[in-house]
């Protein structure tokens, strides 16, 4: 990286979200897909995967009655990372506006973060910026019902 070549500090924070896929309200996911102009046909197809999902719990030999699941993305589904990213995109856009002068400048581009599924890497040139970025990310995520897994934060 350029920062290493010119011997300038670079601060990274690895962020993991707590139970992120499990808490996505499906009604809000459909609204987010509509907000980003995903076609109605695609939204209907995705809704079909989530239509009336239910579970039962077995304890010993006893099986519970079925109960319906109204939130959460499917674990292991190839669509889940993309659906999750779409769900939190508005929060990330608001966060990036607040942190617009921070991050790592490479040529004409500023990189604030890298996101893969529910794992997030924050990038800053100094510790104070990283702290500011982290506080604002926590605030934005909380508005969407998401929490950082503090036990898995790594600087």
List the predicted regions and their residue ranges.
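Nucleotidyl polymerases of mobile genetic elements and RNA viruses
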Residues: 1-155
